[in-house]
């Protein structure tokens, strides 16, 4: 009897604690549709000399379509090259199982905006929104990402 109670308690605890609800930073519903977005997380960071670049991801859903919001931040005391997104831009994620997931940028050109901070650094902020192709979201659930490649308007970067 003790074992049955312990097993029942374990199963109930496991089911209730197994998955926490998704926390949204944006959750909007209006006459146009619905939009939900999660918190941004830093995915990649590169530092070399006085140059640094950061990539942040957040998941979003717009009217039932899953999206990946990408925020590129480049900092430098020297020249900061503009990496532009356009309708031909793509984000490739190679998984540990060898498969490659391709995300397609929405039909919107964006080269970011330049800001200078109080320390004399030029900061380029470039946002982008990528759409998941059919069944690619399911592949991401099965295997972790090993390499990320971004195809910009004029360049490709790993």
Where are these regions (language model features)?
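Bacterial Sec-dependent N-terminal signal peptides
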Residues: 1-24
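A generic "folded-domain core" signal
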Residues: 19-158
